[in-house]
Swiss-Prot record:
Annotated active site: 91 (proton donor/acceptor), 152 (schiff-base intermediate with acetaldehyde), 181 (proton donor/acceptor)
GO terms, biological process: 2-deoxyribose 1-phosphate catabolic process; carbohydrate catabolic process; deoxyribonucleotide catabolic process
Name of this protein: Deoxyribose-phosphate aldolase
UniProt KW keywords: Cytoplasm, Lyase, Schiff base
GO CC annotation terms, alphabetical: cytoplasm
Pfam families associated with the record: DeoC (PF01791)
Organism: Mycoplasma pneumoniae (strain ATCC 29342 / M129 / Subtype 1)
Amino acid sequence: MKLEYNRIIDSTLLKADTLPHEIDALCADAHKYQFYAVCVNPSYVRYAKNILKGTGVKLCTVVGFPLGQTTQRQKVYETKIAIKEGADEIDMVMNIAEFKKRCACVISEIRAVKKVCGKRTLKVIIETALLNQDEIRDAVNVCIDGNADFVKTSTGFSMRGASLEDITIMREASGNLIKIKASGGVQTAQQFLDFFNAGVSRIGTSNAVKIMEELHKLESHEHR
């Protein structure tokens, strides 16, 4: 099993009815497989942080999620609380309506949240399902101008998740100035491998264990 596979996974659990025992399992699996991070809703940051102590697994949470329709001030406040409670990484939803109006406030919003993050990783979700190809390119550049560390495809709560076409456009637009995270609807090992081979730096999925098991089976089959 290639080490890179598990180390680019954000194992994600963001559903509204998540219970503590599910967070327990998420964190235990992340420790077992040494996923790069787990991503949980803000209400579970403190809880998950305690479980992850000493595991080497990073803790990610979301801001302005899932619509992005909160103000810059609110996103900054959410980020401050998340970091105070133990978040290592922030996945923030871009204000898509303001972006479509070509408002410079979108760049300033990203910069403001990144300033709070400091050395912590900021990923900006652009929700590619709601953008055309030119808008995807522009959104990548907005994230670069905003000093984000990653541009991320999707929340997983819109019409669709990541596509290989999205990733191709984002890679071309990025000029290697920003990393790319694919997320939303990544359910199988083949999808995972497609995104991995397309050059993404991180993959978010709520099917991380299933994908790892499938990858192990594929590897075993290849070595027969």
